[in-house]
Design a protein with these regions (language model features):
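Active-site rim/adjacent substrate-binding subdomains
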Residues: 1-151, 156-181
């Protein structure tokens, strides 16, 4: 498909609430494909439609653990390396339906806030109801990186950046230091 430009903090679109998707059309499917391409090109784990300038309630998330590639050849009698669990979602009209009382503080970054990270306190676990691109409703129960990504991307749909809720924000000195999200 196509790469889309990721808009950055300061663009007023990022502070607006996104509109519900009433019908899943080919345009919405193309937008989702473009969002995957854009997110992967930027090494992100999630992307919300407002980040590419579209005020619709659409999110893509991929928190699949990359395979451990240390470059060593496996020994002949070694156990086979298990395939990573694929944790990848397209969420149409996602809605938070439950959060844990327990919270966790972690570093977050954002493709729309390049060069910075912040400490954000979020619920440790979350339940989200959404629809897929075929119109099927489903519920995700996420914790850890998945919970953080779900909450972060749904914030985008509501016009909230992590910088709006971060306890502290710092500039990244080393570009390899960018955390997931």
């Amino acid at each position: 498909m196509a790469l889309r430009k990721v808009i950055v903090e300061g663009d007023p679109l990022l502070n607006e609430r996104s509109r519900e998707i009433k019908e899943i059309t080919d345009r919405i499917r193309i937008l989702a494909e473009d969002m995957w391409d854009t997110m992967y090109e930027a090494n992100g784990v999630g992307l919300a439609a407002p980040q590419v300038g579209v005020l619709r309630r659409l999110v893509v998330i991929d928190v699949t653990e990359p395979p451990d590639e240390d470059g060593d050849e496996p020994e002949e009698d070694a156990e086979p390396i298990p395939e990573p669990e694929i944790i990848k979602y397209v969420l149409v009209n996602p809605e938070i339906i439950g959060i844990s009382e327990e919270t966790v503080k972690t570093k977050e970054g954002c493709l729309s806030v390049p060069g910075y990270v912040g400490i954000v306190e979020r619920p440790e676990r979350v339940r989200v109801r959404a629809t897929d691109l075929d119109g099927n409703s489903f519920v995700i129960e996420g914790e850890g990186i998945l919970a953080k990504a779900l909450l972060h991307e749904i914030d985008h749909l509501n016009g909230v950046l992590y910088t709006d809720i971060a306890e502290s924000i710092e500039e990244i000195k080393d570009p390899g230091e960018q955390p997931e999200s």
